[in-house]
């Protein structure tokens, strides 16, 4: 990489207004009303940071067989199309890194990749990710729920300059705010689609504390068999086999 290209990013992050400009965009994410608004702010934040492209990925795994992926794309939409058509979510080395790590890392610092993982990275390089910074967003649900922000540049080694420490700090702030926003979206959607009530949440909290039906019934001044029936209905709402599985879904999606 030509030294002047490093200076472009180094000079940008040393600008006196750099942090304020980036933070101004980050602060707006909380009030984004939908994905379109979140994408608009991600594009703006990406530009203010000094990157060319960005992808934010949210991953939720309900159990061993069921997983869902959500994306905010601030890059060429053709990349998103190719990613989906090729099923690259199953071989994405950037997401794999985020599942087990919390520190930002440059893509070129990742351990040796498999052939399919290299295919994903080579595909991304054509759409503004010749170099990339991977910023994980950990969650209390560990590998069952994680997000990752990937920032890209068409210039190789773009994120290896002296100014990258401050860049990384701002990128982590952006990633965390996007993670909080996406978490609220997913939680609210499940609450609405499953028609979860405050009484349902109260049952789940009792289950979380290890209370059996008899203890819950005593606390709610009702019968144990009534509690059993309510848990059966709640489990059906959440697509869970039993109350323990229902609690797991609730914890993964942040209902309680």
Q: What is each residue range found by the language model?
A:
Residues 58-82:
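GAF sensory/regulatory domain recognition
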Residues 199-203, 213:
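The N-cap/first-turn positions of alpha helices
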Residues 243-254:
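Short, basic, alpha-helical segments at the C-terminal edge of helix-turn-helix-like DNA-binding modules
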Residues 28-41:
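Signal-transducing coiled-coil linker helices
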Residues 2-25, 35, 145-197:
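Juxtadomain coupling helices with adjacent low-complexity linkers
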Residues 118-144:
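Helix-to-coil/beta transition segments that act as allosteric "coupling" elements at the rims
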Residues 73-116, 122-125:
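Regulatory sensory and allosteric helical modules in signal-transduction proteins
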């Amino acid at each position: 990489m030509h030294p002047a290209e490093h200076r472009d990013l180094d000079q940008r992050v040393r600008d006196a207004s750099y942090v304020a400009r980036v933070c101004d965009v980050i602060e707006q994410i909380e009030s984004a009303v939908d994905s379109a608004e979140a994408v608009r702010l991600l594009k703006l934040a990406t530009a203010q940071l000094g990157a060319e492209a960005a992808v934010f990925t949210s991953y939720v795994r309900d159990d061993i067989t069921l997983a869902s992926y959500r994306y905010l794309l601030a890059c060429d939409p053709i990349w998103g199309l190719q990613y989906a058509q090729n099923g690259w979510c199953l071989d994405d080395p950037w997401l794999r890194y985020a599942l087990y790590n919390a520190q930002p890392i440059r893509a070129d610092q990742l351990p040796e990749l498999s052939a399919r993982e290299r295919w994903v990275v080579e595909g991304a390089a054509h759409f503004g990710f010749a170099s990339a910074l991977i910023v994980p967003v950990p969650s209390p649900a560990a590998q069952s729920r994680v997000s990752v922000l990937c920032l890209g540049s068409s210039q190789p080694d773009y994120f290896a300059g002296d100014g990258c420490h401050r860049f990384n700090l701002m990128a982590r702030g952006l990633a965390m705010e996007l993670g909080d926003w996406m978490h609220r979206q997913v939680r609210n959607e499940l609450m609405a689609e499953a028609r979860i009530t405050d009484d349902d949440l109260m049952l789940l909290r009792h289950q979380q504390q290890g209370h059996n039906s008899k203890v819950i019934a005593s606390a709610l001044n009702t019968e144990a068999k009534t509690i059993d029936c309510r848990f059966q209905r709640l489990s059906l709402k959440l697509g869970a086999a039993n109350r323990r599985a229902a609690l797991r879904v609730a914890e993964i999606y942040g209902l309680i």
